[in-house]
């Protein structure tokens, strides 16, 4: 799942 808040992947 892409974390669009930080740009990193949300694990």
UniProtKB/Swiss-Prot annotation:
GO terms for biological process: defense response; regulation of blood pressure. The modification Pyrrolidone carboxylic acid is found at residue 1. It comes from the Eukaryota. Keywords: Amidation, Amphibian defense peptide, Hypotensive agent, Pyrrolidone carboxylic acid, Secreted, Sulfation. Isoform 3.1Y4 differs from isoform 3.1 in not being sulfated. Signal peptide: none annotated. Expressed by the skin dorsal glands. The modification Phenylalanine amide is found at residue 11. The keyword Secreted applies. It is found in: Secreted. GO terms for cellular component: extracellular region. The keyword Secreted applies. Hypotensive neuropeptide. This is Caerulein-3.1/3.1Y4. It comes from Ranoidea citropa.
């Amino acid at each position: 799942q892409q974390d669009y808040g930080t740009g990193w992947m949300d694990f």
